[in-house]
Amino acid sequence: PFVTTMVSKLRRQHKIDVKAISLITDYDAHRTYIVPYVDAYVLAEPDMATKLIDEYGVDKSIIYPLGIPIFDRFTEPFDKKAICEREGLDPNKPTILLMAGSFGVTSVLSFYKALAERAPEMQFIVITGRNIKLFANLEKVIEETGMQDNTKLLYFVKNVEDYMHISDLIVTKPGGLTVTESLACSLPMAIYSAFPGQERDNAEFLLNKGAAIMLRKKTGADDIVNLVKDKEKLDEMKE
């Protein structure tokens, strides 16, 4: 919204002469997104249009519920067996994808330990992003728990869609882009935590649609294990 506000101000002051399109990359829109001199609002999903029209007075002719743009590879056909073979993973094991880079170091270490203790028969893909400290600490924890053969620890990756395609569940914070990519892959979500504001709104959207569960602080690991073992529930969440 900050960039949109800046562009709106520059247009009002006749300092730029360009079309302005506001792409709302979350599943709810706050007042801060709505400013004059915007030619189009692109929404993540159609139901958001009602709020823009009724509450914020946006002209429906400039509202386009086209979705958040992502790469085509998230929706393209894939070969699970081939991906698993290339990545050294077992295609027959329940697989949990943990997007650990967005969590605090201490919390994700204890959370992974709890998962490993409760589900040693499952396999885990843990992506830390560019968090070097977290990567190093997780290496130690994985060795301590004896889960080297059942855990693939990754730093920054450019093919996250492959890991989404072969996973049964993703554990993540509900950022707009990750949510969209997971939905495109029909990947059920377990929401680790959600800050008030856009993340909380995204979480509410997913919970209302039945595409995610919200993990409880003390029993989050149990929630995940129980869900992954409930194939019927997982299939419902994919729809």
Where do the language-model regions lie?
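Nucleotide-sugar donor-binding patch of glycosyltransferase catalytic domains
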Residues: 188-219
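A nucleotide-sugar donor-handling region in carbohydrate enzymes
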Residues: 39-95, 99-102, 130-131
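Active-site and donor-binding regions of nucleotide-sugar-utilizing enzymes
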Residues: 1-58, 62-65
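Conserved donor-nucleotide binding/catalytic region of nucleotide-linked donor-dependent transferases
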Residues: 213, 218-239
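Donor-nucleotide binding loops and adjacent catalytic segments primarily
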Residues: 80-82, 89-166
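Acidic donor-binding loop of glycosyltransferase active sites
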Residues: 165-174
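A short alpha->beta transition loop at the rim of the catalytic pocket in nucleotide-sugar-dependent
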Residues: 168, 186-188
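Short alpha-helical segment that forms part of, or immediately flanks, the ligand-binding pocket
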Residues: 161, 179-185, 204
